Amino acid sequence: MVELCGGEGEGQIMLATELAQLRAMARELEAKMDPDRVAARELCRALASSVDRSIRLAASCFPPPEHPPPAAGNAGRDAAFKKRKGMAKVRRQVRVTSVQDTASLDDGLSWRKYGQKDILGAKYPRAYFRCTHRHTQGCNATKQVQRADGDPLLFDVVYLGDHTCGQAAVAAAAQSAPPEHAGQEQQRQSSLLAAGTEGIHQQVVAEPMAAPFLFTSTAAGGVDDGYFSFISPANSDCQFSSDFSAGSVGVDMDHEARFEDLFSSTLEFFQSEIQNL
């Protein structure tokens, strides 16, 4: 058995001695190879033993490190993983109004998408975003967005790290906001608006037609031809009345807009009658 070296300098001397002896045995083996095979065989055994001692000396004096140094490519990856592991993580769920709706995912912050990949066992891919001020202001905030498997209108959003750029105040307000997103509020307001519009429409339809319009005119020569009324075939509820008298021509100004519609329908009726002649 070879004794372990006591110190680094002593171990180097013993190792150098063994290697020198090994070199001498190799030269002697080369000289005796052909004349005496028995002696050459014994010399080979001694050579193998010397090599074994040299290896043991080297192992005892220069032990390998407990953890081998990582490769250059893995070092940066491990450092980035440890850095992300120590970041603050905030999870939120955002509900959209439709499958094509992506505006509801806007949280008021400036992000840039840098990747997307399929997740094992997940139905939808996961998108990765980082702050747009990462290179200009050194902001390392990131977020991950993925559609929920059971509900295509629900998104899982994960924020990693805090914003250190100029939009830090906006980010704090967004992360402290309740889960209900602005898209839901917009949908609620749209429903209320639709209901209000429907009520207005019903009111307009149910409103009765005003009294018949009075159209006065003076006939040629000032002769009073009397009074006649006309029911429009386009709308039986609209009555057009005329009274030829000596008065001036006049139209009720409160119903001016409705009179224009009635006049248009009457004109269309007369045009169709003329074409049939």
From Swiss-Prot:
List the keywords (alphabetical).
DNA-binding, Nucleus, Plant defense, Transcription, Transcription regulation
DNA-binding region as annotated in the record:
100-168
Extract the GO molecular function terms from the UniProt entry. Answer: DNA-binding transcription factor activity; transcription cis-regulatory region binding
Which ranges does the record mark as transmembrane?
A: none
Answer whether the UniProt record assigns the keyword ATP-binding to this protein: no
- According to its UniProt record, where is this protein mainly located? nucleus
Q: Does the keyword Flavoprotein apply?
A: no
Show the Pfam families listed in the entry: WRKY
Could you tell me which cysteines form disulfide bridges? none
Recount the UniProt induction comment for this entry. Induced by benzothiadiazole (BTH). Induced by sphingolipid elicitor and chitin elicitor, and a compatible race of the rice blast fungus Magnaporthe oryzae.
Set out the biological process GO terms recorded for this chain's protein. Answer: defense response
**SMART domains this protein is in?**
WRKY
Q: What does this protein do?
A: May play a role in defense responses.
Family named by the database record: Belongs to the WRKY group III family.
What protein am I looking at? Transcription factor WRKY19
Species name: Oryza sativa subsp. japonica
The gene that this protein is the product of is WRKY19
